[in-house]
Amino acid sequence: GKVTGQPLYRLLGGKVRDKVLCYSHVLGKTNEEKAALAASYVKERGLKVIRLRAGAPAANGTLGGGVQDGPKVEPWTPEEEIYNTVEFFIRVREQVGREVGIIYDLHERFSPAQAIRIIRQLEPYDPFFIEDPVAPDCIASLRSVREKTSVPIAFGELYKSRHECLPAITGRLVDYIRCDVIRIGGITEARKIAVLAETYDVKTAWHGPNDVSPITHAVNWHLNVS
């Protein structure tokens, strides 16, 4: 792009849209704080979609809800965590209303049966999509989740090439393929994945956490508008 003096999207075939739907991940030390912040994120930042994950007890403290040197938590069970996840999502939906899309990341925490239970309970509250309900190499489990739920599924941030994406895309087991452009090998591989996904009516939602560079986010934007 720099050599030719052109934006990347033009080298990829030209711009087909002027705007890209973006979301922001809602951060907070506790679930209560995250739920309260969700509405302010929407109002102050003009967001149409937000992404969240409930903090959960874990072996070394708390995951997403505490600090490393904080007080130890009590033992927990999957049943408690399922309830915690569903209750948190409902609370956030009540805070932001029906017009805002909510992305929820299960982050491979649950068994396929547990993921199915959670997603079914969330269906009336209209998630924008559920991210990573099972591990990336568990295609049979992903198929089970797909067949037994109706919420859109996003998947693929740990994939390293288009070849690893094939079963999820060609089987139409996901609604969004969510690869990390750096992890899969760059712009060329990402473009091939996007074309493959479009063939099977799968959308792209490139992985864009806050620990990647602004350059990577810029690449995501150019891929999305081209």
Give the label of every model feature segment.
Residues 1-3:
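Metal- or metallocofactor-binding catalytic centers and their adjacent structured scaffolds
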Residues 120-129, 135-226:
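Shared catalytic-loop signature of beta/alpha-barrel
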Residues 7, 21, 101, 152, ...:
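Proline-centered loop/turn at the N-terminus of a beta-strand
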